[in-house]
Amino acid sequence: MPTPLLYRKPQEGRDYWILDGALKDPEGVLAQAQAREDWIYGFPHKPEPWPGMRALDALTAEELEPIEAFVQKATGSKRLWQGTTPEGATLNHNCFQLVGKDESGPRPHTDSLKLCRYAAVVYLNPKPPEGTGT
């Protein structure tokens, strides 16, 4: 069993980073998400650890490039990659994920420590309610 991480208060610039305006055309990306019909359902619809529904291959390589460049610069990482366990398990990445208000509560985004070192979330909410943080 892996050693659990000790809790330390998250600090911007060490444990997390914020990139405003990450997408050149967020409205276009939102329209792409809304047009998708190939959704995979998670909790509570299916026995998955993740809530809501997902569609794979969300952003194009051109849309991902500036985000990945920011991550590499901010973290000092020379490369970004998708890991696989010896058993063949992997993470989904570059997904649209829609989560309804009754499908989950507020919580941080986390991924398996066996498979990933960095995780990112791009919020696409065209008219977020006041004080929602998106």
Predicted feature residues:
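Fe(II)/2-oxoglutarate oxygenase catalytic core
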Residues: M1-T134
